[in-house]
From Swiss-Prot:
Pathway: Glycolipid biosynthesis; glycosylphosphatidylinositol-anchor biosynthesis. Its main location: endoplasmic reticulum. InterPro entries: Pbn1, PIG-X/PBN1. The gene is pbn1. Residues 1-448 are lumenal. Keywords: Endoplasmic reticulum, Glycoprotein, GPI-anchor biosynthesis, Membrane, Transmembrane, Transmembrane helix. This is Protein pbn1. Belongs to the PIGX family. The chain crosses the membrane at residues 449-469. Residues 470-489 are cytoplasmic. One of its GO terms (biological process) is GPI anchor biosynthetic process.
Length: 489
């Protein structure tokens, strides 16, 4: 196993050499105020059988998880995804259906996962099951340090799992945007058997003091990044104006600072985008959102629908939808002069709810994860991307842009009193309670039977009337022919 631990201090964070003491077999960290990324890489021979048996039949597997809590991002960890569990799977052969992976995901994360598709999303507020799985499969019962280390995942802001058939290695990464309490304090020791490699990086901003540091010298290496953070005042807020009903409108509100062009090269073309992750019970109308009607687009401050994937059936109720939901990439319209625009710029996206199973109250609570909002800018010609070791890839949305595109992330800012990047909606459904008023299930069932019965009687009566009229007509004509024959005789 290989471990890579990276601490990144903010420019305003204090640092003294006594906070990092290196010896021949350990590195001691004391009260270090920094963001942290920890990455562990495993070979096949270090994994439990149920994991490597699934991986050996896979071509690629990428799992992304983000907390529902608001958290900060900073260079070089500057990318975001919507809260929840995201899975992107490429089987090794065309015959592989992903059944084994789905069973493994249920064991590792949650038994309630419905992961029939190769691309999947689920709201997963906690990684408690993952922690228990790691403690059971990777830690000895007497190894308290390993157990405690696994528990630290519960406070992580994001977790990534990656595998590809070329490297035959499973990589697990965790990110903590802030340090706990008074800072990171721990002793990172060398492995006793000297079989595990540990790399530790301490990154920060320091003022140059030595003469050789003051003199400018050309660098021999660089790390161009695709993801960049914007200033702290570049924020956005998500809401669903009441009443939501069955056709809620997702509103993204942004201050003027979010509408200013990001610090991209002058010749770059930039556009503001949002990427929505919608569970199966809520969806957009791709025919409505892909319209070129300028009046509709301008009324919602939208520019265009750029991509959609997943379930887009407009009529199916939720209980017959087999796929997890859908993803939507939309370009947002921005004012020509942001500094003279309204204090708050709102972009609205009309959505629709599917029929959910009945409940006793007549409502069901459902959660919508916040979308991410970002600027996408084309990079300069000749800029090589993808060499930054801290850049996250396979996020689900960055692959929809060209390889030379740079992203500038806006910061989600929940309203006062909210502490989650999730919106809860009360979805109206059929009531099951017998005292729920006139429109209750039994009344509707009885009314349906009565209406269908009356309709059937009306149809039978009409058919009988037609047959009676036809029979009467034939009898009359026959009688007339008989009378004519008698007169002729």
């Amino acid at each position: 196993m290989r471990r890579r631990i990276t601490f990144v201090q903010r420019p305003e964070s204090p640092f003294h050499v006594d906070q990092a003491v290196l010896t021949s077999d350990a590195l001691s960290i004391t009260h270090l105020d920094a963001a942290r990324e920890e990455r562990a890489t495993f070979g096949f021979d270090e994994l439990p059988a149920e994991i490597w048996q699934v991986l050996k039949s896979s071509h690629e597997l990428h799992i992304r998880w983000a907390t529902e809590r608001p958290y900060e991002i900073g260079a070089p960890f500057s990318s975001r995804i919507s809260p929840g569990l995201h899975v992107y799977y490429t089987p090794g052969t065309a015959r592989e259906t992903g059944v084994g992976l789905c069973s493994l995901l249920k064991t590792v994360f949650d038994e309630s996962l419905e992961c029939q598709s190769l691309r999947y999303y689920s709201r997963l507020p906690s990684l408690q099951n993952l922690v228990a799985f790691i403690q059971h499969k990777f830690c000895d019962r007497s190894d308290e340090k390993c157990v405690h280390h696994a528990e630290s995942i519960l406070s992580a802001d994001s977790v990534d799992v990656n595998y590809d058939s070329i490297s035959h290695a499973l990589t697990v990464s965790g990110y903590w945007s802030t340090s706990p309490g008074q800072g990171w304090t721990e002793q990172i020791r060398k492995h006793a058997a000297d079989t595990h490699q540990v790399e530790v990086g301490l990154l920060g901003v320091e003022s140059a003091t030595e003469p050789e540091e003051l003199k400018m010298e050309p660098t021999l290496f660089s790390f161009p990044s695709r993801h960049h953070p914007l200033p702290a005042d570049a924020t956005y807020t998500v809401s669903f104006p009441a009443p939501t009903g069955l056709h809620p409108t997702l509103t993204i509100s942004m201050p003027r600072a979010s509408l200013r062009r990001p610090p991209a090269p002058p010749d770059a073309t930039c556009a503001l985008h949002t990427y929505l992750t919608l569970p199966s019970w809520i969806f957009g109308d791709k025919y409505q959102l892909s319209t070129t009607d300028r009046l509709f687009l301008s009324s919602h401050n939208l520019a265009a629908l750029r991509a959609v994937a997943g379930e887009t059936d407009l009529e199916a109720p939720d209980w017959v939808v087999s796929r997890w939901g859908s993803n939507w990439l939309l370009e947002l319209a921005t004012p020509l002069r942001p500094d003279t625009s309204p204090e708050e710029w709102n972009a609205s996206i009309p959505l629709h709810l599917r029929y959910l199973t009945p409940s006793e109250s007549g409502y069901r609570s459902a959660a919508v994860p916040w979308p991410i909002v970002f600027w996408a800018c084309t990079a300069e010609d000749g800029t090589k991307m993808g060499v930054n070791p801290f850049d996250r890839v396979n996020l689900g949305w960055e692959g929809l842009f060209g390889a030379r595109t740079m992203f500038y992330q806006l910061h989600p800012a929940p309203a006062e009193g909210k502490d989650r990047l999730v919106e809860e909606l009360d979805v109206p459904v059929l009531r099951l309670r017998e005292d729920a008023g006139f429109f209750q299930s039994k009344t509707i069932e009885l009314g349906t039977v009565v209406v269908v019965g009356l309709g059937l009687l009306w149809v039978l009566w009409k058919l009988g009337l037609v047959l009676w009229i036809a029979g009467t007509g034939r009898s009359t004509r026959a009688q007339k022919r008989t009378d004519k024959h008698r007169k002729a005789e």
